[in-house]
Amino acid sequence: MILLGSTGSIGQNALSLARDFRLPVEVLVAGHNLSLLNAQIAEFQPKIIVIADSSRASELSLPKDSKLLFGEEGIIESLHLAQSSFVLNALVGFLGLRPTLESLRLGKTLALANKESLVAGGSFVDASKIIPVDSEHFSLWFLKSDKPFSRLFITASGGAFRDTPLEEIPLQKAQAALRHPNWSMGRKITVDSATMVNKLFEILEARWLFNTKSVDALIERNSLVHALIGYPDGSFSAHIAQADMRLPLAYAMLGKLDQPLGPPLELERLAALSFEPINPSRYPLWNLKEKLLTHPWLGITLNAANEVAVEKFLEGKILFGEIPRYIERSLERFSMIPASIEELFALDSEVRQFAHKL
């Protein structure tokens, strides 16, 4: 396995499965958590390791005959050097797009947890060759058959501020936004869950993966129903499972799963099941949903502006309520359709420069 993003929550879950099912790991790619990476290296003995910063190379304890690479170019080189045919892209942010494109170009099997690859680069990615790892898209894939459908639904937990009084939400700081009610995730995706940007991303991902604009989302507070498919006859199918990222990862890594990964879901827990609409008064960015489905190339601008805003928010430079302004102003300024992957990367850079000045 080639694991891009080994020290994040997805990467750690993937390595838990690799341990349980004795799967070899050839490549580990990580950012700055080198203490955890060292523990992973000691256990899995990868042949190739990639880290973000070459100046920290001395902090690593490397296996004999292993190769150490650095940065984005190192990630791409590792894809070429590795013999493994399976790639799990669990990188965070726009950084994940180029490795996605290169993995597919090299004919490798790609399990995708990097949302931004499709959000920003969906026009240039062959989504039919991707194994989805997001719990929602895995659930749609699990449910989907040749039977015609009328609508796809994914679910949201509502994030950290789902019950916060509306007037208090704009004043919130990072510490409060990082208290997700259901999932243990990375910092950026937890903030994206609170703004509902994460669900906008997933709506766009579903559009590319399943080739439909008929995608919507609902709040299901327990994170037990991950997706639903509506049929022309008015009936629905739902995928119900524990909130455990190892389930979609297991199908991606193993191809199938014929044993439980944990205790079975107690059906009594479904007694309190309910679905709520996503209220734009609480999640103002949700107003962008139809615009993004109609003009999916705007995902490039959405993603770039959001990354800048979330970084500033996590650094304490802006309050939670200022995040939408960065995105809305950027979308007002940039609406062009990139004609090539080079234009896409140029647009991403231009949006970031604009957003940094806001």
Curated annotation (Swiss-Prot):
Protein's UniProt keywords contain Signal: no
Keywords: Isoprene biosynthesis, Manganese, Metal-binding, NADP, Oxidoreductase
Binding residue positions for Mn(2+): 134, 136, 202
Catalytic activity line of the entry: 2-C-methyl-D-erythritol 4-phosphate + NADP(+) = 1-deoxy-D-xylulose 5-phosphate + NADPH + H(+)
Residues reported to bind 1-deoxy-D-xylulose 5-phosphate: 115, 135-136, 157, 180, 193, 198-199, 202
Gene designation per UniProt: dxr
Protein name, entry field: 1-deoxy-D-xylulose 5-phosphate reductoisomerase
Family: Belongs to the DXR family.
